[in-house]
A protein has these predicted regions:
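C-terminal helical cap/extension that packs against the catalytic core
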Residues: 136-192, 231-235
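Short glycine-rich anion-binding loops that position phosphate/pyrophosphate groups of nucleotides
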Residues: 13, 103, 128-131, 155, ...
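Short, solvent-exposed loop/turn segments at secondary-structure boundaries
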Residues: 59, 206-209
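Extended acidic/charged loop-beta regions that coordinate divalent cations
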Residues: 1-40, 81-84, 88, 115
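Nucleotide phosphate-binding/pyrophosphate-handling subdomain across enzymes
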Residues: 38-145
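Phosphate-binding loop of NTP-binding sites
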Residues: 2, 186, 204, 217-235
Length: 235
């Protein structure tokens, strides 16, 4: 829920008066209150989909009668799986996010929707070995949540054709990955993200997805140092 412009993980407390059913409460003009648990921004994992996953975990814990305090502390410190919508650093109110394991269209759609539904505009790096995929299902998610895409690697032309209907700005960087990261940053909106979520395998340009991630992180740090002297900490 949102309160005073802040998104929260929240729950509906069990009713204090047990005899009142929901229908009876409605007759009295009452509306259920929400108990605020933790600001969504306090989570290290990014995206509305991850916030929903956190709520599902809390609901299970609450259902068996365990206290939520320890679970909330664990969630606050949980950094997520490496290379899966993983925050890297932030500079000038633009956050770099590593989703190098986003090697298929479905994973990239989930990342775009998860970040976009939390109100953040996306500047995305796409491309590599497309493994014969149809990229057209990405077009709507890009139209809804992204402003810019830079395309890299062997299947850049195929991706461009598949997502042209999105109407967003598309540019190509060939095999110059560092240039692609710079281009994505240069086009990113304040408060938005630079997202490496390529929808492709890495083999045409890298040894594996981990090398792709490492080069993304290295370039992000270089950009941060050149812009501000040092990267901002990601909470």
């Amino acid at each position: 829920m949102t309160e005073e412009g802040v998104e929260w993980l929240a729950r509906r407390p069990r009713p204090a008066v047990s005899w009142k059913t929901q229908k009876q409460a409605a007759l009295f003009g009452e509306t259920p209150t929400q108990e605020l648990l933790m600001p969504v921004e306090a989570l290290r994992i990014r995206g509305r989909h991850n916030a929903m996953n956190a709520l599902a975990a809390l609901a299970l814990i609450d259902a068996v009668g365990l206290p939520l305090g320890p679970a909330l502390q664990v969630l606050k410190n949980y950094e997520g799986e490496a290379h899966r919508v993983q925050p890297v650093l932030s500079v000038n109110d633009i956050e770099f996010i590593d989703d190098s394991k986003g090697t298929n269209v479905g994973a990239v759609k989930a990342a775009l929707e998860g970040l976009g539904k939390s109100g953040r505009r996306v500047s995305i790096i796409l491309g590599g070995d497309g493994k014969g995929q149809d990229f057209s299902p990405l077009a709507q998610a890009l139209a809804d949540y992204a402003d810019y895409a830079v395309l890299i690697g062997r299947d850049a032309d195929k991706i461009e054709a598949g997502i042209a209907a999105s109407g967003i700005c598309l540019e190509k960087a060939g095999t110059d990955f560092e240039a692609a990261v710079q281009m994505a940053f240069d086009h990113a909106a304040k408060g938005g993200v630079v997202l490496l979520s390529p929808a492709c395998a890495s083999w045409d340009m890298f040894a594996n997805y981990a090398e792709r991630s490492a080069r993304f992180v290295a370039k992000a740090k270089e950009i941060a140092a050149s812009v501000s002297g040092k990267p901002e900490e990601v909470d």
